[in-house]
Amino acid sequence: MNKLKTGLYIVSTPIGNLEDITLRAKKVLSLVDYIVCENPNHSLKLLNKLGIKKKLFALHDYNEKKLIKNIENYQKNSSIALISDAGSPLISDPGFNLLQDYIKKNIFITVVPGPSSVIAGLQLAG
């Protein structure tokens, strides 16, 4: 398998049905070195379904600054995915300070888009 470029991969996850994961999200999650997530137990349901085993770092509003310090050595030569419990990370989720840290250090950042509850709601509204 290919190694991903060092950086932060902001990966959207399914918002209801685990099978709504995109092919690109599955590929990125399988190739990153580490995954930062809100709730490891919740994230493991998706990762186990996909057959992906990675070291997980739990991210919450109360531990975000400490987490940034803890992963500082990994940032320099690792690919790290940021995922939320459902949907797009950073939308009502922790991770803003982590993203700002990557921006400040000029480390590669990319987004892997996925399902959108806003679009789904508009579609259902007719």
Positions of PLM-derived features:
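Short glycine-cluster motifs
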Residues: 76-126
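Glycine-rich, flexible N-terminal cofactor/catalytic loop recognition
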Residues: 1-62
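Conserved strand-to-helix beginnings and helix N-cap segments that scaffold or border functional pockets
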Residues: 22-23, 68-69, 92-96
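Glycine-rich, highly charged phosphate/nucleotide-binding loops
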Residues: 62-71
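Catalytic-core regions built around general acid/base machinery
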Residues: 25-31, 70, 74, 98-105
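Short low-complexity, flexible loop/linker segments enriched in glycine and/or proline
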Residues: 52, 71-73, 126
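Alpha-helical scaffold segments in soluble metabolic enzymes
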Residues: 45, 70, 120, 124
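Short phosphate-engaging motifs
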Residues: 42-43, 67, 117
